[in-house]
Amino acid sequence: MYGGEEFGNSDFYDDYAHTGDPALDLEYERNFYANRMPENVKYFLMNFCQAIKEGNLYDIQNMYENTFPQISDHHFDKTAWPDEQEVGAIVDNDKVFLILYKELYYRHIHARIPGGPKLEQRINSFFNYCDFFNLIISAQNPVMLELPDIWLWELVDEFVYQFQNFAQYRARLTDKSQDEIQQLCVNHSNVWSILCILNVLHSLVDISNIKKQLEAISQGIDPQTVAGDFGKLAFYKMLGYFSLVGLLRVHSLLGDYYQAIKVLEPIEIHKKSAYSHIPACQISTSYYVGFAYMMMRRYADAIRTFSDILLYIQRTKQLYSTRSYQNDQINKQAEQMYHLLAICLVLHPQCIDESIQQVLREKNYHDAMFKMQCGDLEVFKSFFVFACPRFVSPCPPAADAPMEDYVKDPMEHQLLVFMDEVRQQKDLPTTRSYLKLYTTLPLTKLASFIDPNASEDDVSKLLIRLLCFKHKMRNLVWSKGPSGLEGTFKSGSELDFYIDDDMIHIADTKVSHRYGDFFVRKIMKFNDLNRKLKNINI
């Protein structure tokens, strides 16, 4: 009757058939995708969803920090996790969980997939962040969602990172077709735009009232009295705090260092805070604050910021050493800060903690520092390029721009600004080295040291150089107050001088090491430790 047709061939059937009954279709999808997924992945996703529904912070944090990376290493090292459709069938299409899962899904693609994410994945990741932030910001009442602080920090940090990554991707026109450029500039011009990023971060700061809460804490007032309905919840409060750090990073990437420090005004960045319990957040904050200070020529503040955080890293390394992804990131940022600290110490010599000096010696930074002191501009340049943030432009290239690679333009501009400052100071170490040898020195003699064939014109130029020395060694230094922009002008040089007629009078202002204070602090710390040990009941 049917002419011997073969109906046994599976190609004639749809593996993903629907019955028309929503309940049966959902059950079919769940079974269909579950059979394609490894059992441990399926159970992890179901348990992860359940823990988030119940707000079980301990289980959420354990699965986020331990189980998810372990499964990623075992099953998805160089591939993507299951997509939204597959996961949705297992977790009953739970809207909140799927948004959070997709945040991890796209983060994994950015970090692990060779070649990086495709344009469509970058766009989808942006819209997923929009869904998440709209869910929590646009709600009339606070969303009852609890996530561990480490996830909230990494969510905000990843949001800023993906903006930075997309800005660099968009600026690289040489590897794109005309259709792709048209799509980026016309169809998706608002995707990962700087205005969207700033709007989201400021909205999180505002809805949490985090600035008012920080001001209340500094005045000894209960922050709950000014927190509002949203800010009372740890979820919103921590998102607001981390958004301040996100704004610091964004403004630093744009090269607006004044505004970068300005957004942190409620945070007393030189003091420990109850909010600074996430090591990666504290380290990132200090890196961008220190870099901003360096670019603002506030070297004393930059040196203090870098020294404090590098000491913190030395003392707390065991807290994150078991987490390889955090360890790698923190080690890289620490290495960058050692490079920046070396630059600052050459431009503005001063005493620092002996343990930091020891690291600089062990890692042979002193050789490079000696070359910088001798005026080797290439070493300055290589240190800056290695240690600086990956700057971005707030405006993408126009659709009709020449087909060039614009990625390096922002960095080259910042390098130009930095090297211009270095060139103004490159002769100062030589001047300082001569002045340190004398208490009085005639101008003509100093001029002859610098140039044996010095003329009267060279003596006049020497006066300009000495004035430059005075000017460059006088910095604005923070002393107290919540604003990192405040401070008083102080001379940071180890020597001071004045000129009377043609004679230079020099005073060595170097403060000798006070080892007694060091030992007193260690003894007090040891006694405190003894008291705590005696109070422990075994």
UniProtKB/Swiss-Prot annotation:
The keyword Cytoplasm applies. It is found in: Cytoplasm. This is Eukaryotic translation initiation factor 3 subunit L. It comes from Drosophila virilis. Component of the eukaryotic translation initiation factor 3 (eIF-3) complex. The eIF-3 complex interacts with pix. Residues 305-513 form the PCI domain. InterPro entries: eIF3l, PCI_dom, TPR-like_helical_dom_sf. Belongs to the eIF-3 subunit L family. One of its GO terms (molecular function) is translation initiation factor activity. Component of the eukaryotic translation initiation factor 3 (eIF-3) complex, which is involved in protein synthesis of a specialized repertoire of mRNAs and, together with other initiation factors, stimulates binding of mRNA and methionyl-tRNAi to the 40S ribosome. The eIF-3 complex specifically targets and initiates translation of a subset of mRNAs involved in cell proliferation. The lineage of its organism: Eukaryota, Metazoa, Ecdysozoa, Arthropoda, Hexapoda. Its main location: cytoplasm. One of its GO terms (cellular component) is eukaryotic 43S preinitiation complex. One of its GO terms (biological process) is formation of cytoplasmic translation initiation complex. PANTHER family: EUKARYOTIC TRANSLATION INITIATION FACTOR 3, EUKARYOTIC TRANSLATION INITIATION FACTOR 3 SUBUNIT L. Keywords: Cytoplasm, Initiation factor, Protein biosynthesis. The keyword Signal does not apply.
